[in-house]
From Swiss-Prot:
An individual GO BP term: cilium assembly
Broad class of where this protein is predominantly found: cytoplasm
SUPFAM superfamilies xrefs: WD40 repeat-like (SSF50978)
Subcellular location per the Swiss-Prot or TrEMBL entry: Cytoplasm, Cytoskeleton, Microtubule organizing center, Centrosome; Cytoplasm, Cytoskeleton, Microtubule organizing center, Centrosome, Centriole; Cytoplasm, Cytoskeleton, Cilium basal body; Cytoplasm, Cytoskeleton, Spindle pole
Entry function: Plays an important role in centriole assembly and/or stability and ciliogenesis. Involved in early steps of centriole duplication, as well as in the later steps of centriole length control. Acts in concert with POC1B to ensure centriole integrity and proper mitotic spindle formation.
Residue stretches of each WD repeat: 17-56, 59-98, 101-140, 143-182, 185-224, 227-266, 269-308
Species this protein is from: Homo sapiens (Human)
GO cellular component, one term: centriole
Protein name as catalogued: POC1 centriolar protein homolog A
Amino acid sequence: MAAPCAEDPSLERHFKGHRDAVTCVDFSINTKQLASGSMDSCLMVWHMKPQSRAYRFTGHKDAVTCVNFSPSGHLLASGSRDKTVRIWVPNVKGESTVFRAHTATVRSVHFCSDGQSFVTASDDKTVKVWATHRQKFLFSLSQHINWVRCAKFSPDGRLIVSASDDKTVKLWDKSSRECVHSYCEHGGFVTYVDFHPSGTCIAAAGMDNTVKVWDVRTHRLLQHYQLHSAAVNGLSFHPSGNYLITASSDSTLKILDLMEGRLLYTLHGHQGPATTVAFSRTGEYFASGGSDEQVMVWKSNFDIVDHGEVTKVPRPPATLASSMGNLPEVDFPVPPGRGRSVESVQSQPQEPVSVPQTLTSTLEHIVGQLDVLTQTVSILEQRLTLTEDKLKQCLENQQLIMQRATP
């Protein structure tokens, strides 16, 4: 039986209903619904099932800047230039709860993987964490010195990453509320950031037309792509962790192969800046939005044939190590074209001929898992030390109390 062949991405359908630029898109967990927000102050929930009417939610008093489905799919969060966050029930009634979240535009909202909390980012320079069901503010992270464009939880909920107009990406520990590291390599405002599905890496998009990928354990810059001719407005990891898609003001979407560090496709669909992009939870589809007021849904196709069985577990992108000198700053040539064309750039990966790709990938995965184990052991040791210190302090306090009580 012949193996299935990967195909080019294809435009499945497009939704028209917004009356101004589309700012954000997100799929529900079961891919039955797609939410989008717009500068027209409305939130739309589109049904992937043909002939189904969309829901138009009105409640925000200004542009809707961000949207995110809860992990269960039963709730939908949106943020706005009206400084509020609304939690909606995505059904025909469109009921919502309002959070007076920030003192300036809310740029980003994202649920934790357990759905119990969500994080927001704002032009008031803060990142805030909220309890979903108790509708309660929990804490604020405030070391950025300019607008915060985006904030996301790590897959395990332990870390938060934020991107700002202060040209930094900051990594935070949720439990200690401390900034773990600041990444300062961007040459302009950082517009978007997200975690790799494995939780070991982050990717950030910038106004300097670049996309950068860092390891959150070593804080090393792993990959640097300069493929767009204008600002990169959004990005999304494929659930396998092998691909990354970007949306840019140059009107294109670009799909990157992270394992080989190369450009796979350039997609022309939007007339004007592509403002947002997101994969579905399975990776079978991705959606994009633009200043042309359109929401487009694409079928991935290219992920049918993947990099072997090891892709069942998401793993971080290959490091540039030896090829650091030639992959960063490389602007891959893209053939000219317009409309619904899909263009593939053939670029041979620079890998040792003697080592099979599957073996290399497997070894990378093993090394990644060892790093995670090492980090886990280190955390356990720290907790044990902390417990011992507290126990020692308790014993000393008890002895002091007994001494004072003795006549």
